[in-house]
From Swiss-Prot:
It catalyses: N(2)-acetyl-L-ornithine + L-glutamate = N-acetyl-L-glutamate + L-ornithine; L-glutamate + acetyl-CoA = N-acetyl-L-glutamate + CoA + H(+). The record marks A198, T199 as: Cleavage. The keyword Transferase applies. The lineage of its organism: Bacteria, Pseudomonadati, Pseudomonadota, Alphaproteobacteria, Rhodobacterales. This is Arginine biosynthesis bifunctional protein ArgJ. The gene is argJ. CDD domains: OAT. Coiled coil: none annotated. It comes from Ruegeria pomeroyi (strain ATCC 700808 / DSM 15171 / DSS-3).
Amino acid sequence: MAKITKVSPLAPAAFPTLPVIDGVRLASIAAGVRYQGRTDVMLAVLDPGTSVAGVFTRSATRSAPVLDCQAKIGGASDGPAAILVNSGNSNAFTGHYGQTSVAEVTQAVADVTGVPVGRVFTSSTGVIGEPMKHERIVAKLGDLNAALSPDALEDAARAIMTTDTFAKGASRTVGIDGKMVKIAGIAKGSGMIAPDMATMLVYIFTDARVEQGALQAMLSAMTDKTFNCITVDSDTSTSDTLLLCATGASGVDAEGNAEFAAALEAVMLDLAQQVVRDGEGATKFVEIRVTGAANDVDAKVHGLAIANSPLVKTAIAGEDPNWGRVVMAIGKSGAAADRDLLSISFGDILVAEKGWVSPNYREEDAAAYMKGQDLVIGVDLGLGAGKSTVWTCDLTHGYIEINADYRS
């Protein structure tokens, strides 16, 4: 597998300080699933009564762990729960062996932790189509269980990385009825990132109390505005998993609370944008704001057409203000557009309007703007009130180098 030695230029300065979430204990270990000399398995054990919600890839070739999680989400929440994650092998496209592997791992986790097997959730990320050496994971479960700690989120974030160049974490606190509620999450993702999730694993924990059905509804709605609005390379993974766990340890009922919902969405968006900032080979972070569409759905379609266009993304990598490629992407999207109503801007620079280049446009200003690391492309379709924002990165030689060497 490609060895990543250089941290993304778009990375945060440091991993954030995350609060301890009462009711959550974690541990990480090196099991040698694929990598040598680094941790590659994470275990989280959650107190009895924890609600667990999840969203997953819509890929038709979903991995065995995803299928198992989907079957379990929505079950009883009275007992403890556990999450086991490995990196290096996705356990996808592995036939009956993959299902057997998941069954043996989940049963082993249940035996070691005392968690009911129906409340053991697993995720795997890495190479597709190679049998999982799950016996290596099983052999480490006793050590993992013994090492569980409430203050181990950063170690967990590092254990689940594949081609990531930095560990990803985010948190928020919110006051509800005079008490503080904490939310903290970790994520991995760098390539094979596109809406309908990505090659992306995300685990978010809160000490708020939220019933499972309400937690699921909240997560599903917020995913559409966060993780389903990012793309690195337009490829949808077999393994995407986002689990949201509410332990209730704070004693605060957050169901229906607007401040809690806003804080949760902020954590999700923070993690989603970090995934884009770690896009394989990325040197620029790009926000695409679409307004004036016939409706919000059309706006998102246009935004993703721009964000996924190799021609747009390579122009951005080359710092070329090639607005013609944005016009091309809008025209091919399939959503409603009128050439003569269209306006395009790069940052605050109006590039094109009314079907033609803006009379005040100066190429040198746009070229200077494109040299920045954080860019905004604005599109106003002039058709209605629909709007959407999506996030992507540029497409560089680095992306090719990483993926050409992925399995070596």
